Amino acid sequence: MTDKIKGLLEIKKSGITEYAKFTNRSQPNISNKIKRDSWNVKDLILLAKMTNTKLSFLDEDNQPIIFLNEKDLEENND
């Protein structure tokens, strides 16, 4: 997962340092996530927001059927 996150950040001309700042987390905290490859849904939703992309589930025809966004974090208190 870490490679995909880094790849998206690179495509969007950003990096892990900017992601840490965007999420109000310390650089060591993000470095630990990278080392452990321990990303959660909240991390991915915030990454999507930062990179102006969408996080979704696609059906077998590649049609989006569910989108995840910050409202989902509020509903679940994550």
Feature map (PLM): residue ranges:
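N-terminal-biased segments
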Residues: 1-7
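DNA major-groove recognition helix of helix-turn-helix/homeodomain DNA-binding modules
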Residues: 42-58
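Key DNA-contacting residues within the recognition helix of helix-turn-helix
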Residues: 6, 31-32, 45, 59
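Residue-level signal for the short linker/turn that defines the boundary of a DNA-recognition helix
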Residues: 3, 13-15, 39
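Short alpha-helical DNA-recognition segment
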Residues: 13-31
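Short, charged recognition helix plus adjacent turn
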Residues: 56-78
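The DNA-recognition helices of helix-turn-helix-type DNA-binding domains
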Residues: 26, 37-38
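The alpha-helix within a helix-turn-helix
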Residues: 9, 20, 48
